[in-house]
A protein has these predicted regions:
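Conserved NTP-binding/hydrolysis core of motor NTPases
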Residues: 74, 83-260
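Surface-exposed acidic, glycine-flexible loop patches that form ligand/cofactor-binding
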Residues: 2, 10, 89-93, 141, ...
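Conserved AAA+ ATPase small/helical "lid" subdomain
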Residues: 243-301
Length: 301
C-alpha cells in the first residue's frame, strides 16, 4: 500500500512515524537550503485515474515494439524489473550487472536507458554524463537511491577517468564502493555505499584493463535506424507520453512489479543457480566466460 506524506513531511507507516525533509513545506522555497533535496524530491508517487492507467502488459508491449531492434526492448524490460529487486538479488551472491547500450550518435540508446529509469522516476531528471560529472558526484549518486537505476551516459574508453572506470567495475558487478579513511586522522575505514543499479550508454564498448568491465555487463547494440516509419514515431511518442508523470506516469506499473517481491525472494536464488548450471554445461568454463555466465544467469532467472 501507499501511505501519503503530510505537508510537514511526516508519514505514518506500519504504526511508525517517519520524517522526510525532502517533501516538507518547511524547505519549500528556502533557496539553497533545499538544494540537497532537489534530486530526492523527484521520487514521488502519483495516483493515476483508473481510466488513464497504462497496465504492465501495455507498457511491456510498447517497450518491446519501440525498441524492437536486437530485442533491446526485451532486455530493457527484464532489467527494469531486476532493478526493482536489486537489493534482494545482490545479497544472494553479492552480484548484480548492468546493460551497456552501445551505438552511434542519434541511435536512441540513451532513450532506452531513460525508458528503464522512467518506471521509477521522471524522465525529465538529468542523467549523469561520465565525461563532465565528477568522481565524487558519481559516488554520491550510487548511494542516493536504493533500487532506482542511474543512467551513466557518454562512456568513452579514452576520456573516462581511471577512478571512474575502476569504480564502474565494482558498481556494476559486486557492488563494492570506494574505501576511504574516515576523517583526516585516525585508522577508521569507511566504504562508499552502492545501492543503485546502473545503465551505461556509449558509442564504443569498454575495452580497458583486458575487458574487465565488459565481462561484467551485457552489451546491447543499438544501430542507428535509417528510416523511421510514421507508426514507429507514433509508438515512440506514445511511450514517452506514458512515461511522463505530468501526462500519465507509471507509478501503478511499478506497484504491480513490487508486489512480486515475495516470489522473487522465494524463487530467484534457485532459478539463477539453475540457469548458471545450464550455461556451464553448454559452454567452456574459462575465467572471463564464467563471469559472463553469472551475469547472463541473472537475466535468465
Amino acid at each position: 500500500r501507499f501511505d501519503a506524506v503530510n505537508e510537514l513531511g511526516v508519514v505514518t507507516h506500519n504504526g511508525k512515524n517517519y520524517y522526510l525533509p525532502a517533501f516538507s513545506t518547511i524547505y519549500a522555497g528556502s533557496g539553497k537550503q533545499s538544494d540537497k533535496y532537489e534530486l530526492i524530491s523527484q521520487l514521488v508517487y502519483k495516483e493515476i485515474p483508473i481510466d488513464k492507467r497504462c497496465t504492465f502488459d501495455e507498457w511491456a508491449s510498447l517497450m518491446d515494439r519501440v525498441y524492437k531492434i536486437n530485442d533491446n526492448g526485451k532486455w530493457a524490460i527484464l532489467f527494469a524489473i531486476m532493478c526493482a529487486f536489486r537489493s534482494n538479488i545482490h545479497c544472494i551472491d553479492r552480484l548484480f550487472t548492468a546493460p551497456f547500450f552501445m551505438g552511434p550518435m542519434s541511435s536512441g540508446k540513451t532513450q532506452i536507458a531513460i525508458s528503464i529509469r522512467s518506471l521509477f522516476i521522471s524522465p525529465k531528471i538529468p542523467i549523469f554524463n561520465l565525461n563532465i560529472g565528477t568522481d565524487a558526484a558519481m559516488s554520491t549518486l550510487m548511494s542516493t537511491f536504493r533500487d532506482v537505476p542511474v543512467v551513466l551516459d557518454e562512456y568513452n574508453n579514452k576520456d573516462i577517468s581511471d577512478i571512474k572506470f575502476q569504480a564502474l567495475k565494482g558498481i556494476v558487478y559486486d557492488g563494492d564502493g570506494r574505501q576511504k579513511r574516515k576523517g583526516t586522522s585516525g585508522k577508521e575505514i569507511e566504504n562508499d555505499k552502492v545501492y543503485a543499479p546502473v545503465v551505461i550508454c556509449g558509442q564504443e564498448t569498454p575495452q580497458r584493463d583486458d575487458n574487465a568491465l565488459m565481462s561484467r555487463i551485457i552489451v546491447c547494440e543499438v544501430p542507428k535506424p535509417k528510416n523511421r516509419t510514421r507508426e514507429e514515431v507514433e509508438l515512440f511518442n506514445k511511450l514517452k507520453d506514458i512515461e511522463d508523470p505530468a501526462k500519465i506516469g507509471l507509478s501503478n506499473v511499478l506497484f504491480e512489479v513490487l508486489q512480486l517481491r515475495p516470489l522473487v525472494m522465494q524463487h530467484f536464488r534457485a532459478l539463477k543457480q539453475k540457469s548458471y548450471d545450464e550455461l556451464k554445461q553448454a559452454l567452456i568454463n574459462a575465467g572471463e566466460i564464467d563471469r559472463l555466465m553469472k551475469t547472463a544467469s541473472l537475466f535468465l532467472a
